[in-house]
Structures are given as structure tokens and as C-alpha cells.
A protein has these predicted regions:
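Membrane-embedded alpha-helical bundles of multi-pass enzymes
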Residues: 2-212, 407-408, 419-422, 434-442, ...
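Soluble catalytic domains of enzymes that build or remodel membrane lipids, polysaccharides, and related
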Residues: 210-480
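Short Lys/Arg-rich cationic patches that frequently serve as NLS/NoLS or arginine-rich RNA/DNA-binding motifs
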Residues: 277, 505-508
Length: 521
């Protein structure tokens, strides 16, 4: 403990901790609701400066502080679920950025300070966080900050969000090298850093200009119903009377003309299932028959294990159940409670009295000769899942979601940003259907159109052009993550053979790490 206190009292360490906090704040400002996306290109400069010359353990400390600050701001809407949700998720986020810091510290010790290696050390833990624990949490991946920047979306079509994250880190790292070289008046280092930035800009320009164009395969006319206008939890009486279902059926009466698909989003039928309620099923089919449309509805449907699926169901105008898709990636502390028995003393167990069962089959629906995939709620944040649907032949993707629990927070805007990147990665049109907003149509390049406001009843009616063909990301998958892992392994092997000479000057003496083992425990 004395060593920890001595370390934290050191002025150089304090400056670096302050830099980590600053980076966390700046990066949070790059995401919705602030959405200063291009700020991400400089937001990591303080953090990477803090990592420069740092030991592995101290770099891990700086990474942890950065991650906690960033995630604490980005995921502030988790407060709706209490401390039992936000504390472990934010701390877990910090653990992954601590791992990035540790890897960078190991590279420092080996004399390897390349921006490309720092980017690899970022991408690999980011990919791990998207997969483990509890199925992963890709929300807030670095590359998503540039969701409204067309060249970044073009990059995503080549290598997914991971490639965008990689490029952002490289740019930030070269800016640090350039700044230090300028401060130390080291001409060679300035030339190398400037050349690196020029190379990155050139690569992005080429990727943007040579973007793979998916092929139009037809058109589908869709309508999504956004019926919830209550910015609060519904009363017991409202739930019993089917408040949400009635609001959505009332919106359906406003539809005119033929449609191919009409979407009743996640939770729009309250707690009723059309498979166990013939009257409800008849009403859904009647809506479809009136417009010659298939109806995509969502309901809680009994599962074989006695629990329930969160399930999308597709009904034809003739009344046939054409197929179902059960949500695969359930929301921790939202649709199930990890370690339920250990946290049964908290209020969250009262709000989530039972756990859903995850689905196991990825269904491609057939609609008017086209192949349509659906994902439910935050599943649109999982690039590999959506990629697999497209690889199986999906020509359009519908995101059925219920974000009402997050009220008027930035969650819904962040959700749209995730879906933009999925559209850009796959070259498919997306329709985001939400019971309370934000609903939207997103083009194959990730451009958003026809958006709605939160908690306003609305109908999004549009014709989308379905597409076929595989972008490089769909064809080759997470090749950036694999390449980053191999790059780190190669660096580890090279460091055992010889210690390469430092390319860039060290920081001024006042900013260097204090002499010692560098351990904080």
C-alpha cells in the first residue's frame, strides 16, 4: 500500500493520470449524444502520451482510469438499472483498456513503440470485450465514433469497425510521435511521423474510392409502427389492457396502399403472444391482408425449458406463420440477470423477475421473393452476428427494438450509430423499428434517412432497395483482429531475439516515469 501511495503522489504519474482522464472525456464527447465524431482522431493523444515510456503495470493503470471515465460517461443510461448494472460493466470496460495499456507497456519495455503495434494492442482487447463475458459488449467500439463520417464507413466495408478503430489509434499515435518529436526538435522523428500520417490518409482515400458496391436485387416497401408515446413505465392496468398493442394497431389503421412488410417492433404487443392468443393473431393477419403484406411481429413466446424466447414472428397475409427468429444475444441485467442468486438482494431482481432463453437458430425469412433477416435490440451492435446473416443471403435487415427503458438518454442515438456501421460493413439496407424511437431507414452506405423522434407516435414508410454481393468484410470477416493478434505475437517473438533501437526520442525528464519496478501492488 505504501508503494501505491508513493506512486500516486509522484507528479509525473499524476500528470499521466490526468491525461488518461482527459482522453476518457474527449472520447465520450465523440459519441452520441454529443457526437463530435472527428474528435476521436485526437481524443486518444493524451492517453497514448501517458503510455509513452510507461511500465506495463503503470500503463495498465492509466488504461483502466481512461476506460472507467469513458464508459462511465458513455453508458450513463445504465443508471436506470442501478449500481448492480453500471458498476460491473464500467469496471469491466476499464479492465479491457487496462489490458491494452499493459500490452503497450510491454511493447515499451521491448523498445517497440510503433503506432501500428499500439493500434494492434487496442484492437485485440476491444474484440475480446465484444465477446466475453456474458456474450460480450461491443457498445462503444472506438470505430463507431465515426459513424457519420463517410470515409470511415467505407473503411468498415473493408474490415469492419475493427479497421476503423485501428486507423483511429494509428492517427492518434502518430500525432503523439509528431508532438514529442517537435518538442525535442528531432528532425528524423518528425519526418517519420508525418510520413506515417500521410500514408494513413492515402490508404483511407483509396479505400473510400475503391469501395465495393453491392448489387441491387429488387425493392421492398416497408412500414414500421412506432406507437409508444409514454416516457415512463406503464401501469399494471395499462399492461393488462394492452396499451402498447392498441396504440400500434391504431397506427396500422393509418396505413394506405400496398406494402410488402409491416413491422410491429419489439414489445409492441405488450406481454401477449399471438401464438397463444388467437384473437391477437387474427388482428395481425388482418392488418397484413388489408395491405397485401407480411407482418413481422415480436412477442415473448414459451420456450422448451419453461422460460420464454424474445421472438420475432413473420405472418403471411393468408395467416400462415412463415418463420420465427429468437433473440440470441440477450441483454445482461435487462433480459436475464447473471449470478441471479448472488444479487437477489438488489432491486434489479424485482424488475427482472425471470430470465429469457437465448435462441439458437439464425433464420432468413422469405418475403416477396427476397431474403430478409431480423435482429432484436442491441444485437445490431454485434458485427459478426449481422455479417453471418448477410453471408447466409440476407438482402435487407430489420432491427426490431424496444429502447423505452432508457428513456430520453443517448442510448437510442448510440443504437442508430451501431446500425449505421452494420449497414456500411455489409452493404445492406437496414430498417430500425422501435416502439418509442428512434426508428429509421439506413442506406447501404450507412447514411440515415426517415428518422423519428423519441416517444412520438409515428409511421416510417419507405421503399428500400435490397442488395446482394459480399463486401470484403462479409467475405473475410474479422481479418483485422486476426492480423492484429499476429502482429503482436510477431512483436513478442522479435523482442526475444533482439532489442531494436528506439526510433523516437524519450519524453523530457520531468514527464518520464519515476524510476522503479513500475508495479502498483
Amino acid at each position: 500500500m505504501r508503494r501505491i501511495g508513493r506512486t500516486l503522489r509522484d507528479r509525473a504519474v499524476q500528470r499521466r493520470l490526468g491525461a488518461a482522464v482527459l482522453s476518457g472525456v474527449l472520447l465520450a464527447l465523440a459519441f452520441p449524444a454529443f457526437d463530435f465524431g472527428l474528435l476521436a482522431l485526437v481524443a486518444l493523444v493524451p492517453l497514448i502520451w501517458a503510455w509513452r515510456d510507461a511500465s506495463a503495470w503503470r500503463a495498465a493503470l492509466y488504461g483502466f482510469v481512461f476506460g472507467v471515465v469513458f464508459a462511465g460517461i458513455l453508458l450513463y443510461w445504465l443508471w436506470y438499472f442501478g449500481l448492480v448494472a453500471i458498476v460491473p460493466l464500467v469496471a469491466g470496460w476499464g479492465a479491457y483498456t487496462a489490458l491494452t495499456g499493459y500490452l503497450v507497456g510491454c511493447l515499451n519495455r521491448a523498445g517497440l513503440r510503433s503506432p501500428w503495434l499500439i493500434a494492434a494492442a487496442w484492437v485485440v482487447p476491444e474484440a475480446l470485450r465484444a465477446r466475453w463475458p456474458f456474450g460480450g459488449l461491443p457498445w462503444g467500439d472506438l470505430g463507431v465514433a465515426l459513424h457519420d463520417f463517410p470515409p470511415a464507413r467505407a473503411l468498415a466495408s473493408w474490415g469492419g469497425v475493427a479497421l476503423v478503430s485501428f486507423v483511429i489509434v494509428v492517427v492518434n499515435a502518430y500525432l503523439v510521435d509528431l508532438g514529442v518529436a517537435f518538442a525535442m526538435q528531432t528532425r528524423r522523428a518528425m519526418v517519420v511521423a508525418t510520413a506515417g500520417i500521410v500514408v494513413v490518409v492515402a490508404v483511407v482515400a483509396v479505400a473510400d474510392g475503391a469501395r465495393y458496391q453491392t448489387r441491387p436485387s429488387g425493392q421492398l416497401r416497408l412500414a414500421t409502427l412506432q406507437g409508444n408515446d409514454q416516457d415512463r413505465y406503464l401501469t399494471t392496468e395499462e399492461k393488462r389492457s394492452g396499451y402498447l398493442a392498441e396504440r400500434h394497431f391504431a397506427l396500422a389503421e393509418r396505413l394506405h396502399g400496398p406494402y410488402d412488410v409491416i413491422v410491429f417492433p419489439e414489445s409492441s404487443l405488450d406481454e401477449f403472444s399471438p401464438e397463444s392468443n388467437p384473437g391477437l393473431r387474427s388482428r395481425l393477419v388482418a392488418v397484413g391482408r388489408a395491405h397485401g403484406a407480411d407482418v413481422l411481429a415480436n412477442a415473448a413466446v414459451p420456450a422448451p425449458d419453461g422460460r420464454e424466447f424474445n421472438q420475432n414472428l413473420l405472418y403471411t397475409p393468408e395467416g400462415r406463420l412463415a418463420g420465427t427468429y429468437s433473440k440470441e444475444h440477450l441483454v445482461p441485467f435487462g433480459e436475464y440477470v447473471p449470478f441471479r442468486s448472488a444479487v437477489d438482494w438488489t432491486g434489479i431482481v424485482d424488475r427482472i423477475p425471470y430470465d429469457y432463453t437465448p435462441g439458437t437458430q439464425r433464420t432468413i425469412f422469405r418475403v416477396k421473393g427476397h431474403r430478409l433477416a431480423t435482429v432484436i435490440c442491441f444485437e445490431s451492435a454485434f458485427g459478426p452476428l449481422v455479417r453471418d446473416f448477410v453471408a447466409r443471403g440476407a438482402e435487407v435487415v430489420v432491427v426490431s427494438t424496444n429502447n423505452r427503458s432508457y428513456r430520453r438518454s443517448a442510448n437510442s442515438e448510440q443504437h442508430i450509430a451501431q446500425t449505421q456501421m452494420r449497414a456500411a460493413e455489409t452493404g445492406r439496407p437496414f430498417v430500425q423499428a422501435s416502439i418509442s424511437g428512434i426508428s429509421a431507414v439506413i442506406d447501404t452506405d450507412g447514411h440515415v434517412r426517415d428518422t423519428t423522434k423519441l416517444f412520438h407516435q409515428a409511421v416510417v414508410s419507405d421503399t428500400v432497395t435490397t442488395t446482394t454481393g459480399e463486401t470484403p468484410y462479409v467475405r473475410f470477416g474479422e481479418w483485422v483482429v486476426v492480423a492484429s493478434a499476429l502482429l503482436l505475437l510477431g512483436a513478442a517473438a522479435a523482442s526475444r531475439v533482439r532489442r531494436p533501437p528506439a526510433t523516437f526520442p524519450k519524453l523530457p525528464a520531468a514527464d518520464r516515469e519515476p524510476v522503479g519496478s513500475g508495479r502498483i501492488t
